[in-house]
Regions:
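Catalytic-core loop-and-flanking beta/alpha module that positions acidic residues
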Residues: 1-269
Length: 269
């Protein structure tokens, strides 16, 4: 099965050159409701710590998506339903990430909680109520996050998008304790440094500690990318076609096709 992503020709060029897909932070997507509400007793805004790549499973052309993301002049990328390089964690869990634990400038990300899975959006009457349920107390000052459902709720009016998503979850960390361990000890122990970082995870998320990273890029599987299908938008020009054909030259098995609406929509400028 293929999945589909509507985007600009410029973005297609970046994807083909880098052979990566960009996951954008949830508090920067078009639907502000996905990130403005807090979750659980801590009222944590999980959109700061969730990164998404948005697709649709529907092979039927969606005029709303053509308009929203390309103004009818971009492309629709069609690719295998699992387009990324994946990494097996155990017999039951396959991750989008290779490393059990890696660090950004102010966050930690782990293969253990980032499943290689395409999550279907749930369209609901009250997204705020659903988002509120995503965090529960654990012990005195700990929290448990329902990670599989984070970033999966939108208001019913968005249902026209028929959206599915890949997701990445990061954990904010306070580097202060680790830095003190490194700077104040003559022979700092790696274990102690890591413990300082781990100790900061729960409090950092509960206090809505901001992170600076706005996107994360993940490698596409080159075998899947080689078989990519590109549909030209209804209002693309002959010059646009020439550009797309040039971009796909390194991918001889890729295919180009026209929108069923080609020549059937009026360009209003």
């Amino acid at each position: 099965m293929r999945i589909y992503h509507y985007t600009s020709i410029q973005t297609l060029a970046l994807i083909l050159k880098s052979q990566k897909i960009r996951f954008n932070r949830l508090d920067r997507v078009d639907d502000m409701e996905e990130s403005i509400y807090g979750s659980g007793p801590t009222q944590t805004k999980l959109g700061m710590y969730t990164f998404v790549s948005c697709w649709t499973k529907s092979c039927k052309e969606n005029l709303a998506l053509w308009n929203m993301y390309t103004r009818y002049k971009g492309v629709r990328i069609g690719i295998d339903e699992m387009p990324f390089v994946t990494h097996r964690v155990n017999d039951r869990f396959v991750s989008l990430l290779a490393s059990p634990m890696s660090f950004g400038p102010d966050y930690m990300i782990s293969s253990f909680v980032n499943e290689a899975k395409l999550f279907d959006m749930e369209y609901v009457d009250d997204p705020q109520a659903e988002i509120q349920k995503l965090i529960h107390r654990a012990g005195t000052d700990g929290i448990v996050v329902d990670i599989p459902h984070v970033g999966c709720f939108k208001r019913k009016e968005w249902e026209i998008q028929q959206e599915s998503r890949f997701k990445l979850t990061v954990h904010p960390v306070n580097m202060t304790g680790a830095a003190e361990e490194l700077l104040t000890k003559e022979s700092p122990q790696a274990f102690n440094v890591l413990m300082k970082l781990f100790e900061s995870l729960g409090p950092s998320m509960a206090s809505n500690r901001p992170i600076s990273t706005t996107h994360i890029d993940l490698d596409l599987d080159p075998v899947k990318l080689a078989d990519v299908e590109i549909m030209l938008g209804p209002l693309t020009s002959e010059a646009d076609r020439i550009i797309v054909e040039a971009l796909l030259r390194p991918f001889p098995n890729a295919t180009i096709c026209d929108s069923v609406f080609n020549g059937k929509l009026r360009d209003k400028g």
